[in-house]
C-alpha cells in the first residue's frame, strides 16, 4: 500500500499563525513521519495557493506585481514550516508552469467529458479600468446598516451581501462607478454527480464521520458551480480571456506538485493501491469532500481521496483569532521564544484534532512543565543519567531471564506500540500521545519501585536498567513523529539509531533535553499580544459625532418573532416573521450561525422599521433586527429586560 499525504495549500497573502499549524500542518507531518518510520511507501505533498482576488487587490493597492506578493509569502510560509519541523517531498506553487499546464489539461478533460457549459450572467464592469469586477473589487454602502461594505460582506453589521445590493457602489481600484454588463461564465455540472458523490462518501470507510455528515448534507442541494472569473491573474481557461476560479484549480495542485517528483507521480494518482489523505482546516471541508471528488469523478482517471481530515479552529486566550485585529500569534514569533517541539506537543495534546480548542500561554506552560517534562523528561533523564553513571553504556541482557515485573513493563511497551499505531492510522493523534505519556508514567513507577540505587546485585541492576532503557527507546521511537528534534537529541545521548533495537552502545554524557519554560518568557509574550490588541483598538477608526436629529429619523420598535426558518441557499441567513403590533413583517437576518430558528420564536427583538426593503438571496427583507457583536465574533440579539408589547417604540 502507498500513502499520499497532502496539506491544504497556504494562501500567499501572509505568513502562518498557530491556527494553521494546529489544524493542518502538524497533524499531517505526524502521520507522514510515523508511516515513514514504519517503512511504508509514503510521500507528503504541499505548497502555496497563489491566485485569487485578494492577491491582485493587495498587489494593486501596494503598487507591486502579483508575482512579487506571491514570491514573498511563498518563501515566508516555507520558512515557517521548516521552523515547525514539517517536512515535504514536494512543495510547489500554483503559479508554476507545471501547475498551470496540469490544471488546463484537467479542465479540457472535464470539457471533453461534457461537464463544462457556458451561461450568461450579469456582473459589475468598470469602464475606467476596462474590466469586470469580482465581488471584492466592488465596495459601497451597506443597504442595511449604512456602513462601508465589500461586495460580498459588510464588516459593520456582518451581513452577507451580493454586489448589486450595495448603495453607491464603486470600483476599489479607480473609485469610479461601475456598470452592470452581461458576461459569459463557465460552469461545472456538479449537480449531475449527486448519485456518484453520495456513493463515494457513503463507501469512504476511513473518512471521519463528521466530514461524511457535512458532505452528505451539502450533496442534498447540489448546484452547478461557476468556475470562471473575469480577471487576468490566475490559470487561463483555454480559448477564453478568463481565468479559472481558484477553487477549481487549487486542488489540482495536489496532482501537479506530485508531478515535481517525476514519473513516480503516476503511482500515487493512477494506481489503485494508494491511500490519499487530505489534511485541511474545517472551513474548507466541503471544497475537499464534495467539489474536489466531484471534479475527480468527472475527469475519470485519478484516485479519489481516502479521507479528508479536517482540523478544528484554534482560539487564542479564549478569543477568536483575527489577523486584522492583531489578535494572533505568528509561527515565526512563537518559535523565537519557545521550542517548536513544545508547540507540536501542546497543540496535539490540547484536544482531539476534529474539535475546536484554545491556545492559552499559561496552559501551554503548565502542560509542558508539569506534564511533558515532569513525566517524560524526568523519566528519560533519570534512566540515562543513572545508567551512564553505573555502566557507561546500556547493559544488554537475555530477556527470557527477566523477572515478571520487568516483562510486564516490556509488555506495556508492546501494547503501547500497537495502540499508537491504531490511533495514528485513525487520525486520533491526541489518543496516541496519551498512550505514549501513560507508558512514561508506567516507566517512572517501575523505576521508583525497583529502586536501582539500592540494588547491590550487579546482574539484577543490569536487568532493571535494560528494562528502563528499552522503555526509553520505545518512547523515543514513538515520540519522534510528534517531537522530532527532542527525540533525535535523546537518541544522540543513547548513541542509538531511530528504531526499536537496543545495541548496548556507549552512552554519551547526559544532559537535560527537556528544559522548563520560563514564566518570564510567557509573560513577555502575553504582554506583547495584549499590547497589539490595545494598539489596534486605539488605532481603530472613530465614528464621527452626530446630531440627535439623525436618531429621530430611525423608527425603532420592539418586535416579537412569530416564525423563523432556514434559507437553505445561504450559510448565514434566516427568514423571520416579526409581529410589530399593528402589522407583521418578513425580515432576513444574518444570525444563522448563532441562533437556531426554533429558539427565536417568541423572542422580543429590536427592529429598524423604516429601512428600505431589499432582497437577500432572493428573499424580501422589510427591516433589520439589531444585534451586538464583540471582538471575538460573539453575537447577541438586542432585547428588552422586561415584557413589553410588540410595536412599542424605542426612544
Swiss-Prot record:
Q: Subcellular location, in the record's words?
A: Cytoplasm
Provide the assembly information.
Homodimer.
Q: Where is this motif: 'KMSKS' region?
A: 320-324
Residues of the signal sequence? Answer: none
One GO term of the biological process aspect: methionyl-tRNA aminoacylation
Which residues of this UniProt protein bind ATP? Answer: 323
Name the UniProt record assigns to this protein? Methionine--tRNA ligase
Where would you find the membrane-spanning parts of this chain? none
EC annotation from Swiss-Prot or TrEMBL = 6.1.1.10
**What protein family is recorded?**
Belongs to the class-I aminoacyl-tRNA synthetase family. MetG type 1 subfamily.
Q: Gene Ontology cellular component?
A: aminoacyl-tRNA synthetase multienzyme complex; cytosol
The record's section on HAMAP family has:
Met_tRNA_synth_type1
The broad enzyme category this protein falls into is ligase
Q: How is the cofactor bound?
A: Binds 1 zinc ion per subunit.
Q: Which InterPro entries match?
A: Anticodon_Met (IPR041872), Met-tRNA-synth_bsu_C (IPR004495), Met-tRNA_ligase_1 (IPR023458), Met-tRNA_synth (IPR014758), Methionyl/Leucyl_tRNA_Synth (IPR015413), MetRS_core (IPR033911), MetRS_Zn (IPR029038), NA-bd_OB-fold (IPR012340)
Q: What does this protein do?
A: Is required not only for elongation of protein synthesis but also for the initiation of all mRNA translation through initiator tRNA(fMet) aminoacylation.
Q: Which reaction(s) does its UniProt entry say it catalyses?
A: tRNA(Met) + L-methionine + ATP = L-methionyl-tRNA(Met) + AMP + diphosphate
Q: What residue intervals hold the motif 'HIGH' region?
A: 10-20
Amino acid at each position: 500500500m502507498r500513502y499520499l499525504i497532502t496539506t491544504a495549500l497556504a494562501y500567499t497573502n501572509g505568513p502562518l499563525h498557530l491556527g494553521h499549524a494546529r489544524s493542518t500542518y502538524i497533524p499531517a507531518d505526524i502521520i507522514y513521519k510515523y508511516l515513514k518510520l514504519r517503512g511504508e511507501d509514503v510521500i507528503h505533498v504541499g505548497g502555496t495557493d497563489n491566485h485569487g482576488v485578494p492577491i491582485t487587490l493587495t498587489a494593486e493597492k501596494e503598487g507591486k506585481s502579483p508575482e512579487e506578493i506571491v514570491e514573498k509569502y511563498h518563501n515566508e510560509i516555507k520558512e515557517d514550516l521548516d521552523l515547525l519541523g514539517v517536512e515535504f517531498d514536494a512543495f510547489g506553487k500554483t503559479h508554476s508552469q507545471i501547475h498551470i499546464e496540469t490544471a488546463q489539461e484537467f479542465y479540457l478533460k472535464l470539457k471533453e467529458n461534457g461537464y463544462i457549459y457556458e451561461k450568461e450572467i450579469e456582473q459589475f464592469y468598470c469602464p475606467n479600468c476596462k474590466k469586470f469586477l469580482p465581488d471584492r473589487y466592488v465596495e459601497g454602502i451597506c443597504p442595511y446598516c449604512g456602513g462601508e461594505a465589500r461586495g460580498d460582506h459588510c464588516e459593520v453589521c456582518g451581513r452577507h451581501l451580493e454586489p448589486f445590493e450595495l448603495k453607491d457602489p464603486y470600483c476599489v481600484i479607480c473609485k469610479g462607478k461601475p456598470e452592470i454588463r452581461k458576461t459569459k461564465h463557465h460552469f461545472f455540472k456538479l449537480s449531475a454527480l449527486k448519485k456518484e458523490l453520495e456513493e463515494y462518501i457513503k463507501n469512504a470507510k476511513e473518512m471521519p464521520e463528521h466530514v461524511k455528515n457535512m458532505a452528505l448534507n451539502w450533496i442534498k442541494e447540489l448546484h452547478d458551480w461557476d468556475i470562471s472569473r473575469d480577471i487576468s491573474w490566475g490559470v487561463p481557461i483555454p480559448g477564453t480571456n478568463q481565468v479559472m476560479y481558484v477553487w477549481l484549480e487549487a486542488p489540482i495542485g495536489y496532482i501537479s506538485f506530485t508531478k515535481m517528483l517525476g514519473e513516480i507521480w503516476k503511482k500515487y494518482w493512477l494506481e489503485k493501491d494508494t491511500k490519499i489523505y487530505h489534511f485541511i482546516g474545517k472551513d474548507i471541508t466541503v471544497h475537499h469532500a464534495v467539489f474536489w471528488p466531484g471534479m475527480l469523478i468527472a475527469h475519470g482517471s485519478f484516485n479519489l481521496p481516502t479521507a479528508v481530515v479536517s482540523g478544528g479552529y484554534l482560539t487564542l486566550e479564549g478569543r477568536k483569532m483575527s489577523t486584522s485585529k492583531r489578535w494572533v500569534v505568528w509561527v515565526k514569533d512563537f518559535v523565537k521564544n519557545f521550542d517548536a517541539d513544545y508547540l507540536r506537543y501542546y497543540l496535539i495534546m490540547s484536544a482531539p484534532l476534529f474539535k475546536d480548542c484554545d491556545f492559552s500561554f499559561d496552559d501551554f506552560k503548565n502542560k509542558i512543565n508539569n506534564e511533558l517534562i515532569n513525566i517524560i523528561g524526568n523519566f528519560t533523564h533519570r534512566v540515562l543519567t543513572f545508567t551512564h553513571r553505573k555502566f557507561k553504556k546500556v547493559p544488554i541482557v537475555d530477556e527470557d531471564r527477566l523477572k515478571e515485573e520487568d516483562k510486564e513493563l516490556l509488555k506495556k511497551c508492546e501494547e503501547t506500540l500497537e495502540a499508537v499505531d491504531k490511533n495514528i492510522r485513525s487520525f486520533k493523534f491526541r489518543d496516541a500521545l496519551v498512550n505514549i505519556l501513560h507508558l512514561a508514567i508506567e516507566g517512572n513507577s517501575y523505576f521508583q519501585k525497583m529502586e536501582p540505587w539500592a540494588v547491590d546485585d550487579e546482574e539484577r541492576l543490569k536487568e532493571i536498567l535494560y528494562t528502563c532503557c528499552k522503555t526509553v527507546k520505545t518512547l523515543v521511537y514513538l515520540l519522534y513523529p510528534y517531537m522530532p528534534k527532542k527525540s533525535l537529541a535523546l537518541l544522540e545521548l543513547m548513541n542509538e539509531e531511530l528504531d526499536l533495537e537496543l545495541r548496548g552502545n556507549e552512552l554519551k554524557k547526559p544532559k537535560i533535553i527537556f528544559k522548563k519554560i520560563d514564566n518570564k518568557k510567557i509573560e513577555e509574550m502575553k504582554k506583547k499580544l495584549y499590547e497589539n490588541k490595545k494598539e489596534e483598538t486605539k488605532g481603530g477608526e472613530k465614528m464621527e459625532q452626530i446630531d440627535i436629529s439623525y436618531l429621530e429619523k430611525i423608527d425603532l420598535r420592539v418586535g416579537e418573532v412569530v416564525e423563523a426558518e432556514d434559507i437553505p441557499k445561504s450559510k448565514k441567513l434566516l427568514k423571520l416573521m416579526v409581529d410589530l403590533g399593528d402589522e407583521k413583517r418578513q425580515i432576513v437576518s444574518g444570525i444563522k450561525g448563532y441562533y437556531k430558528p426554533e429558539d427565536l420564536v417568541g423572542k422580543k427583538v429590536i427592529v429598524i422599521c423604516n429601512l428600505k426593503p431589499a432582497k437577500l438571496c432572493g428573499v424580501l427583507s422589510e427591516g433589520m433586527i439589531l444585534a451586538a457583536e464583540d471582538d471575538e465574533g460573539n453575537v447577541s440579539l438586542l432585547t428588552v429586560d422586561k415584557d413589553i408589547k410588540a410595536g412599542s417604540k424605542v426612544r
